[in-house]
A protein has these predicted regions:
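Adenine-nucleotide phosphate-binding core of ATP-dependent small-molecule kinases
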Residues: 147-197, 232
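Glycine-rich phosphate-binding loop plus the immediately following alpha-helix
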Residues: 90-146
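Glycine-rich phosphate-binding/hydrolytic loop that grips phosphoryl groups
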Residues: 61-68, 106-110, 225-252
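Phosphate/pyrophosphate-binding loops at sites that engage ATP/ADP/AMP, CoA/4′-phosphopantetheine
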Residues: 15-30, 185-197
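Glycine-rich phosphate-binding loops at beta-strand->alpha-helix junctions
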Residues: 34-42, 188-217, 232
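Short glycine-rich, Thr/Ser-proximal phosphate-binding strand/loop in the N-terminal lobe
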Residues: 1-13, 93
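Conserved phosphate-binding catalytic cores of ATP/NTP-utilizing and phosphoryl-transfer enzymes
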Residues: 42, 48, 52-76, 81, ...
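Conserved phosphate-binding/catalytic loops in two-lobed NTP-binding clefts
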Residues: 50-57, 215-238
Length: 252
């Protein structure tokens, strides 16, 4: 990851980093494809290399379907915030809704609560945490919950915060809050689209808690949650695929 004060500096830094890590030069690059909100900050070709832009939603949808091998489904891109799309292999892409809860939420809360904002640091710290010292569960408030309610379900995020909660416990609570908020919205999206398939992409999919969290949603609601290989790079891969589809040539 390249950290910079502005989008353009980040772009050029990321490109240089990619070339260096892969032993490439600018002469090896035949096309540059930009996507995401940061793409709006640049115009024209980069370093004289043919450069084009692809709509982020189209890129995310194409990448998710290609990596998962699914014909259609709800695509969830968990980035700084979270976007929910309906996507089909025939090219249909519909933006369902979005949420301000995502990786940015996790980073901001953890910076204040535990003094960390780096994704890797939070991921490792949260793995050591105990959610029972942070969250209130159904079994904490009811001896006879409804049949549709698992006793271990969260009744209130941060609703049972212990005085001796450690930084690891707090980090685990933040990660759980973000993943569960996203999970609930996937249920609503599936109901709206009459589908049972959810394809998850973005950096948050690499959190160890992500698999367990969405397995719980799958068990409770019967939807299929797919985290494809290379899900972190789904939007970038989709941008490349869209570019090849829209402007095919002999030198991809």
């Amino acid at each position: 990851r390249v950290r910079a004060e502005d989008q353009v500096t980040s772009l050029y830094g990321a490109l240089g980093n990619y070339l260096t890590r892969n032993g490439l030069t600018l002469q090896d690059v035949r096309r540059i494809v930009l996507t995401g909100v940061g793409a709006s900050y640049t115009e024209g070709d980069i370093f004289g290399i043919p450069t084009c832009k692809v709509d982020e939603f189209s890129a995310s949808a194409a990448g998710a379907l290609a990596l998962s091998g699914r014909e259609q489904g709800v695509v969830v891109t968990m980035g700084t915030g979270t976007a929910f799309l309906w996507a089909e292999q025939n090219g249909t892409v519909r933006h369902l809704c979005g949420s301000g809860i995502g990786g940015g939420t996790m980073g901001g809360l953890c910076r204040k609560l535990v003094g960390m904002e780096r994704f890797g640091q939070i991921r490792e710290l949260a793995r050591q945490g105990d959610l029972s010292k942070v969250d209130l569960t159904i079994k904490d408030i009811s001896q006879n919950p409804a049949a549709t309610l698992d006793p271990d379900l969260t009744a209130a995020n941060f609703g049972n915060l212990a005085e001796d909660a450690t930084p690891a416990d707090l980090a685990a609570g933040v990660v759980n809050l973000v993943l569960q908020a996203v999970g609930i919205m996937t249920v609503l999206a599936c109901q709206a689209c009459n589908t049972d398939t959810v394809i998850l992409t973005g950096a948050m999919t690499t959190m160890p808690q992500a698999v367990e969290n969405f397995q719980n949603f799958q068990r409770l609601f019967g939807y299929q949650y797919v985290i494809p290989e290379n899900a972190t790079f789904a939007t970038a891969i989709g941008a490349a695929l869209c570019s090849l589809r829209d402007t095919p040539d002999n030198n991809p």
